[in-house]
Amino acid sequence: MKSLFRPLIVVFVVLAAVTGLAYPAVMTVFGQAVFPSQANGSLIEKDGKVVGSALIGQQFDAPQYFWGRLSATSPMPYNAAGSGGSNLGPLNPSLKDQVKGRLDALKAAGTDLSQPVPVDLVTASASGLDPEISPAAADYQVARVARARKMPEADVRRLVADNTAGRQFGVLGEPRVNVLKLNLALDAAQTAQ
């Protein structure tokens, strides 16, 4: 009986060492050597202090900032521990209430609602943590942000264009604008004036 369990124990120990120690250690070293920023969470710094991550959205609700997608996490917006889809169907009254609330917030901030509102400004993403909006959603907010910052709209549009990332490898995904990076660029541009 002892001879039956010995190979099982040896295989278990070897596989545990390979999959639990060796593989994670090799991947950590590889990630730190080849992709250090991504391996450390794609952190964004301002004046030497970490202000966020390029991978997780942040709440911006002041009129002088671009607003991101709604967060599906509550009670704390953009809480990664509470990530998960909102799973609200198109006929769910809660979805209608969320969209109406966001439209009211856009209207209160002085946004012109006579034009169609990009869907990513009034709905949450699948994870509820999306840090990016579409160029159309950014363009929709240009007038409000420019007015609140007393900046020419052309300057704000240029910053949006400068912070628009294209499709990955030219074919994957859609063009997108990272809201945190754009808002930091706005702050920097206004400070430079």
UniProtKB/Swiss-Prot annotation:
Record localization: Cell inner membrane
Top-rank taxon, per record: Bacteria
Example GO molecular function: ATP binding
Bilayer disposition of the protein: Single-pass membrane protein
InterPro entries named among the record's database cross-references: KdpC
Keywords linked to the UniProt accession: ATP-binding, Cell inner membrane, Cell membrane, Ion transport, Membrane, Nucleotide-binding, Potassium, Potassium transport, Transmembrane, Transmembrane helix, Transport
Pfam families: KdpC
Transmembrane segments: 7-27
CC annotations in GO: plasma membrane
Protein purpose: Part of the high-affinity ATP-driven potassium transport (or Kdp) system, which catalyzes the hydrolysis of ATP coupled with the electrogenic transport of potassium into the cytoplasm. This subunit acts as a catalytic chaperone that increases the ATP-binding affinity of the ATP-hydrolyzing subunit KdpB by the formation of a transient KdpB/KdpC/ATP ternary complex.
Family affiliation: Belongs to the KdpC family.
HAMAP family (alphabetical): KdpC
Subunit structure: The system is composed of three essential subunits: KdpA, KdpB and KdpC.
Name this polypeptide is given: Potassium-transporting ATPase KdpC subunit
Organism encoding this protein: Burkholderia thailandensis (strain ATCC 700388 / DSM 13276 / CCUG 48851 / CIP 106301 / E264)
This protein's encoding gene: kdpC
